[in-house]
Amino acid sequence: MIIVTGGAGMIGSNIVKALNEIGINDILVVDNLKNGRKFKNLVDLDITDYMDRDDFLTQIMAGDNFGPIEAVFHEGACSATTEWDGKYMMLNNYEYSKELLHYCLEREIPFLYASSAATYGETTVFKEEREYEGALNVYGYSKQQFDNYVRRLWQDAEEHGETLSQITGFRYFNVYGPREQHKGSMASVAFHLNNQILAGENPKLFAGSEQFKRDFIYVGDVCKVNLWFMQNGVSGIFNCGTGNAESFEEVAKAVIKHHGKGEIETIPFPEHLKGAYQEFTQADLTKLRAAGCDVEFKTVAEGVAEYMAIVNG
């Protein structure tokens, strides 16, 4: 069996879909369906069982046996970069992750987890090294701290001549694609621009968006990276982006091209995001490629075109 936490979320449900596509259906999805709209992400997927996050954690902490587990994809987290309740964030993203990690280590279960490019902050160098990390929000800090916890485990194991079972962290950059409709304000720019055009409006970007460049990665490519590491058993913390930064304008142009209408409008940059907003991200893929991962990534034009074709039928 494979366990996917956050399995009703965007990346988690797409991982379940990718597993289904290679013939794997023995999957336990763990999530919190308090936001009941997420159920739509699971309707067309084949899984063995569903379990509430709190019930799952209770069983993990009790050391309960789930039977043979081939791998755990830990995508479950509070992913709102605008959430400033640090107690809640650290409990969800740090403490819970440690519990599950140690459960997997004790049983030598491969543990593949979601980190984030939010760990980097304002740097212009995006290498998986401590000197380039400096989160701008408590979400990024929760991910940064868990990465550092994993690093300490590796260091301790090395000092004692031990080898740990597989731990693989993925620093997701700006992920977009199907199954994100439940995310509200945290959904991708492509999602919001598409909805604006469908509502008869022009697509709207923040003032200065022509200067804001991000590494936008299509969720299908994120899944390919996850499955490659599951199948090849490589440990480490790796960037999961395309290696290319493209502007928000390019995203808007791709959405406009799909619809054949619309002109970009600019709106004022929100006060609450000033000082906590990454204006530039671009994954350094040196470490990913050195590990042997040869997944090819879609450009914004290619990925948004595929996304629009799926969501607009």
Curated annotation (Swiss-Prot):
SUPFAM superfamilies: NAD(P)-binding Rossmann-fold domains. The keyword Hydrolase does not apply. Its cofactor is NADP(+). Contains a large N-terminal NADP-binding domain, and a smaller C-terminal substrate-binding domain. It comes from Vibrio vulnificus (strain CMCP6). It is an enzyme of class 5 (isomerase). Its EC number is 5.1.3.20. Homopentamer. The gene is hldD. This is ADP-L-glycero-D-manno-heptose-6-epimerase. Gene3D superfamilies: NAD(P)-binding Rossmann-like Domain, UDP-galactose 4-epimerase, domain 1. Binds 1 NADP(+) per subunit. Catalyzes the interconversion between ADP-D-glycero-beta-D-manno-heptose and ADP-L-glycero-beta-D-manno-heptose via an epimerization at carbon 6 of the heptose. NADP(+) binds at residues 10-11, 31-32, 38, 53, 75-79, 92, 143, 175, 183. Substrate binds at N174, S185, H192, F206, A207, G208, S209, R214, Y277. Keywords: Carbohydrate metabolism, Isomerase, NADP. GO terms for molecular function: ADP-glyceromanno-heptose 6-epimerase activity; NADP binding.
